[in-house]
Every structure is written in C-alpha cells, then in structure tokens.
C-alpha cells in the first residue's frame, strides 16, 4: 500500500494543487496525508473528490497556519 504524506505549506496556488495532482497520478497512493494546507476543511472536500478520493477527514487551519487532511480510497474501508 502506498501512502503519500506531504507538508504542502499551503494549497492556495494552482501550481501547488497541480503538483499534488501530479504526485497522486504518478504514485497512485491508497492514502494521502496533507499537513499545513492553510485551507478550511470544507474547501478541501471539493479537492478530495476531484482527485478521486471519496473517504477522508480534515481539520481546519487556524488563521493562515495549520490544517490537516487524510484521504483514502474507498476500497480500504
């Protein structure tokens, strides 16, 4: 099982989201863990679905720091 963990230091730029998309496409992880997203959990829900993950949890950032997300493929349930 492949797990991708990344301290992305913010997902506000399209280029950073593109990098994440490329990493997921290349490695095809079963689980993705993101730290320092600097985004609200609600905003991460749309990205999670667009990247092919249906399951996951997220913790809101506080101001412009923090934020965590863990996504997994639905076959892991």
PLM region spans:
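Short phosphate/oxyanion-binding micro-motifs
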Residues: 1-77
């Amino acid at each position: 099982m492949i797990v991708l963990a990344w301290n992305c230091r913010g997902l506000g730029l399209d280029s950073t989201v593109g990098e994440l998309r490329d990493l997921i496409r290349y490695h095809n992880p079963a689980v993705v863990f993101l730290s320092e997203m600097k985004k609200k959990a609600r905003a991460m829900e749309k990205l999670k679905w667009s990247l092919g993950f249906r399951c996951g949890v997220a913790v809101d950032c506080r101001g412009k720091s923090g934020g965590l997300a863990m996504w997994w493929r639905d076959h892991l349930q």
